[in-house]
Curated annotation (Swiss-Prot):
Residues 19-34 have a biased composition (Basic and acidic residues). SUPFAM superfamilies: MFS general substrate transporter. InterPro entries: MFS (IPR011701), MFS_dom (IPR020846), MFS_trans_sf (IPR036259). One of its GO terms (molecular function) is transmembrane transporter activity. CDD domains: MFS_Azr1_MDR_like. Belongs to the major facilitator superfamily. TCR/Tet family. The keyword Transmembrane applies. This is MFS-type transporter CPUR_05422. The chain crosses the membrane at residues 52-72, 93-113, 123-143, 157-177, 184-204, 212-232, 249-269, 285-305, 326-346, 359-379, 383-403, 416-436, 449-469, 525-545. It is found in: Membrane.
Length: 577
């Protein structure tokens, strides 16, 4: 690695901000991983601070609890929205309640990766939790729709930090060989949260008030906050400890962030509005997409021209497994959201069940995902080669997706359940593969940025492909129902997002045609999920075959006689920051 040789050279004159930041990042964190030793074979030091099993268990419990709260927060609102709109008389704001959270979470994900790489992971995670809890309190107490939307936006920012921070906490605490089981459990926690989120929201809304969907985060989030404060051990000196305040600010890639955040905002707004609020050829959509493209190109240029302070350093993309992992994350995330979002719509339209029952019909997919996440973690910890399980899991996932594209009006319930189980089980086996690849192939200082890149891909793909699916569904319905009596009225219902309203609006003799149109249109949506599942197979197949059970080779020392920087190396568990 070029950075290692650069560390052996003495510095002359005043260093630039980027040089200081680069040296601080690499030298400070690399000293955490390997003990100073004479030339020759060196045994790497376990990068995880030593602490009691009880303290580690409490920390992991708090990390899982924080992740559970964030995952539930994404879905708990779905069953509460009718009551929220009734209280605020804000039917026109419904779209913002969910999208603003996803927008800010996605937009700030990469920035938090940079923060975790440069500053104390413990402090950044605690601040993220505080932001999330404060936003939850604001949402619960919001006097009007505008305040509620602001609270959801801030909640998304805190969630972005918690998503990446929980994995970073595991990296700092658990040895690499033992992480697959822990991350498998984390995947199971996220899957469980997705299942019960709407149920919890419905229970609070019906029995108490929808505001408790957000107040409930405060006591449990407070417990996680206290446990992380006391039990999350990180090195005393952060990579940015030697930088001045000005240098710390400059190291955060302010130009890149200023370009990236509005680019994502433009993209998600265009996807939210395109084909529904405005036609795709409307001037507002064209301006948003054009501005998005310009900002993204400018962001890439900044990352290339200023690599030492880049939010996504180009050196990350020099690792084959990182690029393959990013592709896999996008593929799995988009396929997951396509099916999780549109399977309930299939049940509500083709099978005629209500919203609650359609969620129950999704349980085979989600339960198999939870089980496979746990099984995958155990197998990865036993086998060591995560790529093998990733290829197998993504292949099973693709087969399940392909079978679900055959759903029609006559398909049996047994096949509906079986195909979901196949898809969910394959997805669960492959779900953690990108994160394990990043942790294995990247130097430890760059792991937070790599993890943030994976979460960014997952969130961005979810936002994009749910919107893509909605546009495919609407366009397919319009083309298949053209010529039916009352088409203009049906067209307005389709474009306004009405699902069962379209079926209820047609006379009895036309219902079968509408059901067939829905079934065929949703097949086309599922084909998109199949295509992305196949991309996941390509992504996992391109990953390097690394064994997490083998200890990494120590970094090469400087050539004999070369000047070196001397610095004390900590060999004890570091204290709090």
């Amino acid at each position: 690695m070029s950075a290692m040789s650069a560390m052996g050279k003495p510095e002359h004159g005043s260093a630039t901000t980027s040089d200081l930041e680069h040296r601080a990042t690499e030298s400070s964190l690399e000293k955490q991983d390997v003990e100073a030793a004479p030339p020759g074979p060196v045994k790497p030091v376990d990068p995880s601070p030593k602490q009691s099993t009880l303290k580690t268990t409490l920390l992991l419990a708090s990390v899982f609890l924080a992740m559970f709260l964030v995952a539930v927060d994404r879905t708990i609102i779905s069953t509460a929205i009718p009551s929220i709109t009734n209280d605020y008389n804000s039917l026109n704001d419904v779209g913002w309640y969910g999208s603003i959270y996803l927008l800010t979470c996605c937009a700030f994900q990469l920035l938090f990766g940079k923060l975790y790489a440069m500053y104390s992971a413990r402090v950044v995670l605690l601040v993220s939790l505080v932001i999330f809890l404060a936003a939850s309190a604001l949402c619960g107490a919001a006097p009007n729709s505008e305040a509620f939307i602001v609270g959801r936006a801030i909640s998304g920012v805190g969630s972005a930090g918690i998503f990446a921070g929980n994995i970073v906490a595991i990296v700092h605490t658990i040895p690499l060989a033992k992480r697959p089981k822990i991350q498998g459990l984390m995947g199971a926690v996220m899957g469980l949260a997705t299942i019960i989120g709407p149920l919890i929201g419905g229970a609070f809304t019906t029995r108490v008030t929808w505001r408790w969907c957000f107040y409930i985060n405060l006591p449990f989030g407070g417990l996680a906050l206290v446990a992380i404060f006391f039990y999350f051990k990180v090195p005393n000196r952060s990579p940015a400890a030697d930088l001045s305040l000005k240098q710390k600010i400059l190291s955060l890639d302010i130009p890149g962030t200023i370009l990236l955040v509005p680019a994502i905002v433009c993209l998600l707004l265009a996807l939210q509005w395109g084909g529904q609020v405005y036609d795709w050829n409307n001037k507002y959509i064209i301006v948003l997409l054009t501005l998005m493209a310009v900002l993204f190109v400018a962001f890439i240029a900044v990352q290339i021209c200023l690599p030492k302070t880049a939010t996504v350093p180009p050196r990350l993309l020099m690792h084959r497994s990182v690029v393959a992992g990013f592709l896999t994350t996008i593929a799995i995330g988009s396929a997951q959201y396509i099916f999780v979002y549109y399977i309930p719509i299939w049940f509500q339209t083709v099978r005629g069940v209500n919203a609650v029952d359609s969620g129950i019909q999704l349980l085979p997919l989600m339960i198999s995902f939870v089980v496979a996440s746990i099984v995958g973690g155990l197998l990865n910890q036993r086998i060591g080669y995560y790529t093998a399980l990733g290829i197998f899991g993504s292949s099973v996932m693709a087969v399940g997706a392909g079978l679900m594209t055959t759903w029609n009006l006559e398909i049996s319930q047994g096949k509906v359940i079986g195909y979901q189980i196949l898809f969910g089980f394959g997805m669960g086996l492959a779900f953690q593969t990108p994160n394990l690849a990043v942790q294995t192939v990247l130097p430890r200082p760059e792991v937070p940025m790599g993890i943030a890149l994976m979460f960014f891909g997952q969130l961005l793909s979810a936002a994009i492909f749910v919107a893509v699916g909605q546009n495919i569904l609407a366009n397919q319905l319009l083309s298949r129902l053209a010529g039916i009596d009352g088409f203009e009225h049906l067209k307005s219902l389709i474009l306004s997002g009405g699902v069962t309203a379209v079926i209820d609006a047609v006379p009895e003799e036309s219902k079968h045609r509408v059901l067939v149109a829905y079934s065929d249109a949703l097949q086309q949506v599922f084909i998109v999920g199949l295509a992305m599942s196949c991309v996941g197979v390509v992504g996992t197949s391109c990953m390097e075959w690394k064994n997490i059970l083998k200890k990494p080779a120590p970094p090469a020392g400087p050539p004999a006689g070369a000047p070196t920087e001397s610095a004390p190396v900590e060999t004890k568990a570091a204290g709090h920051t």
